[in-house]
């Protein structure tokens, strides 16, 4: 975890990709916890980093259905594939000024490019 001093120096400029549909399942072992809770959906979130663990404004999320035969390994692999789609797409959107963050508020001016990169399954605003 990064210190509050470090985070404050880069406020609003540090991203994290997290393997869950935040705010659910902050921290480690997300796939095992999802399976243990018999959830039907899982996914990935991109958010701005704050001093609190896996907290901060959500920029985007992608979800998938948990298959009846999923194991921690298979679910992890499928979520990782979503991470590989979503993270670079969000970074591109930030670089091209399609997403704006003011405090805790996130506003997207254009989601079409991000949707085309990710196959259209991105959630804006992020899932509740």
Predicted regions and their residues:
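SAM-dependent methyltransferases
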Residues: 101-128
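Donor/substrate-binding cores of folate-linked one-carbon enzymes
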Residues: 1-109
């Amino acid at each position: 975890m990064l210190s509050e001093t470090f985070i404050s120096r880069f406020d609003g400029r540090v991203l994290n990709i997290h393997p869950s549909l935040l705010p659910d399942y902050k921290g480690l072992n997300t796939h095992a916890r999802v399976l243990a809770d018999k959830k039907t959906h899982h996914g990935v979130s991109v958010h701005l980093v704050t001093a609190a663990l896996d907290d901060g404004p959500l920029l985007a999320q992608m979800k998938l259905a948990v298959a009846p035969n999923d194991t921690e390994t298979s679910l992890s692999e499928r979520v990782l594939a979503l991470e590989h789609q979503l993270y670079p797409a969000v970074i591109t959107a930030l670089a091209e000024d399609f997403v704006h963050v003011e405090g805790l508020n996130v506003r997207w001016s254009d989601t079409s490019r991000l949707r085309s990169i990710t196959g259209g399954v991105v959630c804006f605003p992020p899932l509740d």
